[in-house]
């Protein structure tokens, strides 16, 4: 492959990376809208829980279930041993009672696209 061919391949690869990042940002923004409509009442704002109900979801990815400084943590969640990642959050948000019987979590995801966008949003919270 000549220099031009290598440069063209690199440019296309970088364009794909930039395009994917922009798509991820769009998905996270869509997830924030779903979060604001369906989750914020119990889990509060983006950086911390504003209400003493559900725990703050800031920094949820990589955190052990049932830990965090704010909100109510149910014993079943604390005893679950789960460390939240995208897959465990997907299972839990799809059917909280099936994943952790006895959890206080009341809501669940209604469709896959909204669930994936909320997961994208949760991954942005630190």
What are these regions (language model features)?
Residues 1-9:
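Bacterial N-terminal signal peptides that target proteins for export
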Residues 8-17:
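Bacterial N-terminal signal peptides
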Residues 16-34, 45, 49:
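Electrostatic cytochrome c docking/interface patches
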Residues 29-36, 50, 58, 87, ...:
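Sequence context surrounding c-type heme c attachment/ligation sites in exported
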Residues 31, 36-45, 118, 122:
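The canonical Cys-X-X-Cys-His
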Residues 32, 44-83:
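Gly/Gly-Pro-rich "capping" loops immediately C-terminal to redox-active cysteine motifs
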Residues 85-126:
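C-terminal capping alpha-helices of c-type cytochrome domains
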